[in-house]
Amino acid sequence: MVKCLIVDDDYKILHYVSQHLEAAQIQTVTQASGESAIAYLANNKVDIAVVDIMMTGMDGFELCQLLKNDYDLPVIMLTARDALSDKERAFVSGTDDYVTKPFEVKELLFRIQAVLRRYQINSQDIIKLGNVTLIQEYMELSVDSKNVNLPTKEFQLLFLLCGQPKHIFTRDTLIERIWGFDYEGDERTIDVHIKRLRHRLNQLKATIEIQTVRGQGYRVITHV
């Protein structure tokens, strides 16, 4: 069962959202502050977080950044603020989606399901390329006898590239396939993830390489 963390300092909203998500077979955990949410995550795992922006103490923007950077969690921001600048700041903070109050819980549910589909792991899929094996079930990169569990986005990016070796993927395609078509953040996030992957592959002495094709994008090739 999917487990959703809901963070809002309005207890009525916590109860309202939790009640409806539970009815849709989504397990929920509610926290009334960003600080308590981080404390909970120190010893517990969830699949997705729904975060209110306007909270006392740690606000939703700061919490979203922590959830993305430290836990690589999918996040949907929930707020009464509809200004374009707020939406922009939300996406810069790393949110996967944005819902404005008042809202229909069905809409929130649809968005949760859509975001989770982008993060979904198919346990049947294994890719072997050169001396590299990628196992989706565990988000595991294996090079010879060395195993590394990758962050979700890094794994999804490498899995996509390795699934079609020599195929050139544009930045736009990679962003749409991994972050979603409605992603409004900086496209340079692709470059950051590629740099990290290259470093990992180099350290593990992998026989695959992520190449930059000038003016086009990225592809994976193998070295014998």
UniProtKB/Swiss-Prot annotation:
Its main location: cytoplasm. The gene is hssR. It is found in: Cytoplasm. Residues 124-222 bind DNA. It comes from the Bacteria. PANTHER family: HEME RESPONSE REGULATOR HSSR, REGULATOR OF RPOS. InterPro entries: CheY-like_superfamily, OmpR/PhoB-type_DNA-bd, Sig_transdc_resp-reg_receiver, WalR-like, WH-like_DNA-bd_sf. The keyword S-adenosyl-L-methionine does not apply. Keywords: Activator, Cytoplasm, DNA-binding, Phosphoprotein, Transcription, Transcription regulation, Two-component regulatory system, Virulence. Residues 3-116 form the Response regulatory domain. This is Heme response regulator HssR. One of its GO terms (cellular component) is protein-DNA complex. SMART domains: REC, Trans_reg_C. Phosphorylated by HssS. PROSITE patterns: OMPR_PHOB, RESPONSE_REGULATORY. Pfam families: Response_reg, Trans_reg_C. The modification 4-aspartylphosphate is found at D52. The lineage of its organism: Bacteria, Bacillati, Bacillota, Bacilli, Bacillales. The keyword Lyase does not apply. GO terms for molecular function: phosphorelay response regulator activity; transcription cis-regulatory region binding. One of its GO terms (biological process) is regulation of DNA-templated transcription. Disulfide bonds: none annotated. Member of the two-component regulatory system HssS/HssR involved in intracellular heme homeostasis and tempering of staphylococcal virulence. Phosphorylated HssR binds to a direct repeat sequence within hrtAB promoter and activates the expression of hrtAB, an efflux pump, in response to extracellular heme, hemin, hemoglobin or blood.
